[in-house]
From Swiss-Prot:
This is DNA-directed RNA polymerase subunit Rpo5. One of its GO terms (biological process) is DNA-templated transcription. The keyword Nucleotidyltransferase applies. Its EC number is 2.7.7.6. Pfam families: RNA_pol_Rpb5_C (PF01191). Part of the RNA polymerase complex. GO terms for cellular component: cytoplasm; DNA-directed RNA polymerase complex. Its main location: cytoplasm. Signal peptide: none annotated. GO terms for molecular function: DNA binding; DNA-directed RNA polymerase activity. The gene is rpo5.
Length: 78
């Protein structure tokens, strides 16, 4: 079974590099200020994202309709 097929898992997609710059500029932040998600997360592995990629997470929201969040993919250091 694919993790992304589960009803509770929101849609994740890799943001193209060109779009990342626009997002950072829009929110006036640096890439290191984005929330993080680990490279070994099952959804990240399934979509093929690698360390340094930015992922868009699209959730249905009862109040906002749709909620979009961005995460920076990082390696887990043990």
């Amino acid at each position: 079974m694919k993790v992304t097929d589960h009803i509770l898992v929101p849609k994740h997609e890799i943001v193209p590099k060109e779009e990342v710059e626009e997002i950072l500029k829009r929110y006036n932040i640096k890439i290191q200020q984005l929330p993080k998600i680990y490279e070994d997360d099952p959804v990240i592995q399934e979509i093929g994202a690698k360390e340094g990629d930015v992922v868009r997470v699209i959730r249905k929201s009862p109040t906002a309709g749709v909620s979009i969040a961005y995460r920076l993919v990082i390696k887990r250091i043990i």
